[in-house]
Amino acid sequence: MFEITSLLGNISRKDSDVYLHAHINFSDESLNVYGGHLVKCYISATCELVVTVLNGTINREFNEEIGLNLFNLN
């Protein structure tokens, strides 16, 4: 059993699809902490989140120069 100790990220759009970029830290029963990018997870009981909604849409585009999907704020 793990407990989420931190979850932070953003939700944007890429090619009209929802794009989640999230970092997670979680601890085990021995108090070891693990972290990294959240790709998939299943919540067995509860997970309390605060989501701040901004006006407009934030899109991502692939940047060939650095090889990452970056915000396009234009």
Q: Which residues fall in each region the model found?
A:
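Mid-chain, well-packed structural core segment of small domains
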Residues: 1-38
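Flexible glycine-rich active-site/ligand-binding loops centered on an Asp-His dyad
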Residues: 17, 36-74
